[in-house]
Structures are given as structure tokens and as C-alpha cells.
């Protein structure tokens, strides 16, 4: 599943294509959304907002389209009037005079007003977004030490969107390598130096993944553009200590780490 940085990069592309322009054609596949097609035609997309792995499309009329791609959903940007040949099922089409954004294969799609956004179960449940630049290291440390999270092993905690929104498996792996921590640890066991290193990595690694631009190489995964240190590198040498990177399964996901420098 794409993680927070990839969802945010996709949102940037959608916003560049259609934001601020009147919608000339709106189409929804789901019957419960059909009534909104006429209401949204002529309105503008004001912005695309990410909340972890969820995407909120805010319209000038006050409505917001909630979507979550899960494993198979994908957005595409095409020219106005263009319909790509694909076996995917089209769910949403938002078109302006010169461009269209298409959502394929997603199953979680809802239209919300302001109260609906505030009360939405998933949006209420998710923690602060790691790509929210106002989120600080100290705030992450506070969450790590909170009674709700301080006894959770990092192998599971860093996948929990209630802790920090936008993290996922490759970020979990790279964050723990950066902080030199084994996945079995809990925040309550760490000293302040270790806590600080982990909190910094929880912000720096996702932001590096989002901000990095350039050529995608053989280390790519769901569009991540920065170099992996341990993810998908089982059997190779750790670039920090020279140890051999190992692979196992934790929280039902593949996990990579270096036993030589992740204590």
C-alpha cells in the first residue's frame, strides 16, 4: 500500500492539474454519489488534503470528497475528454476545461459536509500527520511516552495510524534503522537520547521521502524516491556497520533490520 509521502505526491499532481478551475464535468460510479454530480459541476476544487493515507478533495461549494485508496485505488491525471484504456474500474471523474483527474478501483469514497469531516470515524481515529510541518519532535516524543502508546512494541506501533498518520511498512523499517533500534523495543524502555533519535526519525524519514525528487532507481517501492538503507536489502551489507541485513515478518509485514547496529 502506498504510504503518506506517495499519497501526498499524488495529491500535489492532482492539485496542479485541476485546483482553482471550474469543473465542467463530474461523474461518480456509486449511486449514492450521483446526486452530487450536478451540484459540483461549475464548482472548483480548492485543494487536496492528505490525512495519512486518506485524501480529502475540498470543493468551493463546501463539500469534501473523502477517499482512501487501500491496496488498489489509484488517481490519474489525463487531458480533458480522455479516457485511458485500462482494466481498472473508474470510480470518480473530475474534469475541467483542460484536464481531468480520475480515481480508479477505490472502494472507500464518501461525500461529506464540514460536520461530516469533523465526525468521520477514520479521520477522528488517525493521529497527527507526519508530513504536517507544524508537527515537532517534542510532540512526537510526547505521543511515544503517552499511556496509550508507551508500552507498544515499535514493530506494531509504527504501523498504527492512530499513533502517527502516514507511516507504513517501508517507513517503519527505515525509521528504526535510522534510530538504531530493534523492533521489539517500547518507548518506556528508552533513554532520552534514544527517544529523541526515534522521534526525529519519525519526522525526517517520511519528509525526506516526500521531498526527494529525481530518478527512481532499483530501490523504488510504491514511488519512494530516496535510497533505502535496509528495506528490500536482505543479505546485503549494512552501510553503517557492515553487518548483514536480515529479513523476518513482524505484524504480518516483511521487516528488514541490521542486527549489528540495531540494538
Swiss-Prot record:
Annotated GO MF terms: class I DNA-(apurinic or apyrimidinic site) endonuclease activity; damaged DNA binding; oxidized pyrimidine nucleobase lesion DNA N-glycosylase activity; zinc ion binding
Cofactor info, note text: Binds 1 zinc ion per subunit.
Residues the entry annotates as binding DNA: 70, 125, 169
InterPro entries in the record: DNA_glyclase/AP_lyase_DNA-bd, DNA_glyclase_Znf_dom_DNA_BS, EcNei-like_N, Endonuclease-VIII, FPG_cat, MutM-like_N-ter, Ribosomal_uS13-like_H2TH, Znf_DNA_glyclase/AP_lyase
EC number in record: 3.2.2.-, 4.2.99.18
Active site positions, chain numbering: 2-3, 53, 253
Zinc finger (FPG-type): 229-263
Record-level GO BP terms: base-excision repair
The protein's required cofactors: Zn(2+)
Catalysed reactions listed for this entry: 2'-deoxyribonucleotide-(2'-deoxyribose 5'-phosphate)-2'-deoxyribonucleotide-DNA = a 3'-end 2'-deoxyribonucleotide-(2,3-dehydro-2,3-deoxyribose 5'-phosphate)-DNA + a 5'-end 5'-phospho-2'-deoxyribonucleoside-DNA + H(+)
Protein role: Involved in base excision repair of DNA damaged by oxidation or by mutagenic agents. Acts as a DNA glycosylase that recognizes and removes damaged bases. Has a preference for oxidized pyrimidines, such as thymine glycol, 5,6-dihydrouracil and 5,6-dihydrothymine. Has AP (apurinic/apyrimidinic) lyase activity and introduces nicks in the DNA strand. Cleaves the DNA backbone by beta-delta elimination to generate a single-strand break at the site of the removed base with both 3'- and 5'-phosphates.
Annotated HAMAP family: Endonuclease_8 (MF_01253)
Family statement drawn from the similarity comment of this UniProt entry: Belongs to the FPG family.
PANTHER family, A to Z: ENDONUCLEASE 8
The protein, known as: Endonuclease 8
Organism field: Cronobacter sakazakii (strain ATCC BAA-894)
